[in-house]
Amino acid sequence: MSKVVIVAKIKIKEEFKDEILDELKELHKSTHDLDDGCIQYELHKDLEDTNSFTFIETWESAELLEAHMATAHFASFAKTIENKLDALEISKLEKLI
């Protein structure tokens, strides 16, 4: 079973920055506290764009990543961010070396 790496780039609309940043922090905490298979779940801020953030995640398997995406806390986050982002780009990766 291969580990899965996720890079999720989020650009928040200016007027929602504080609200969504709080939600990102809560999602980080809930994921670490509740989700099996989470090896890494780090939130980074962009040094050149104050409205942009990146999650770098590592999961033990694709199945455990899918389980995370089916949790109540992830569903709540997804609903909260609706229409509050300028951009969302998600890359699903597998480490080669």
Region locations from a protein language model:
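An amphipathic, aromatic/His-enriched active-site/gating alpha helix that lines ligand/cofactor pockets
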Residues: 26, 30-38, 58-91
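Non-catalytic surface loops within mature trypsin-like serine protease
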Residues: 12-14, 61, 94
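Glycine-rich beta-strand-turn "strand-cap" elements at beta-sheet edges
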Residues: 5, 42-49, 78-97
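N-terminal first-folded block
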Residues: 4-33
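Short, well-ordered beta-strand segments in beta-rich or mixed alpha/beta enzyme
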Residues: 4-10, 42-69
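Short flexible/disordered coil segments
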Residues: 14, 69-70, 96-97
